[in-house]
């Protein structure tokens, strides 16, 4: 079975080799038919501490690394600086 991959934005990099990634999802409410946006934070392993808050990253499911980390950063795009 293939590993799940999610796309999100880094919201915190204050831990060593770990980033917190916010993943947004959209769905339609089954009764009211309104599009709703929900978000969830995932702790992901970042071996080289290369991603900073605001960067767009892709995370992939992995075996448990610690109590909260079950995802690994696969690739990312640094945000453009002005």
Curated annotation (Swiss-Prot):
Output the GO biological process annotations, alphabetical, semicolon-separated: translation
- Single GO MF descriptor: rRNA binding
- Which cellular component appears as one GO term in the record? cytosolic small ribosomal subunit
Q: Which Pfam families match?
A: Ribosomal_S17
**InterPro entries recorded:** NA-bd_OB-fold, Ribosomal_uS17, Ribosomal_uS17_bact/chlr, Ribosomal_uS17_CS
Q: Which cysteines are joined by disulfide bonds?
A: none
Keyword 4Fe-4S tagged: no
* Listed NCBIfam families: PRK05610.1, uS17_bact
Q: Which PANTHER family did the record assign? A: 40S RIBOSOMAL PROTEIN S11 FAMILY MEMBER (PTHR10744), SMALL RIBOSOMAL SUBUNIT PROTEIN US17M (PTHR10744:SF1)
Q: What does this protein do?
A: One of the primary rRNA binding proteins, it binds specifically to the 5'-end of 16S ribosomal RNA.
Q: What is annotated about its quaternary structure and interactions?
A: Part of the 30S ribosomal subunit.
Family designation: Belongs to the universal ribosomal protein uS17 family.
What name does the UniProt record give this protein? Answer: Small ribosomal subunit protein uS17
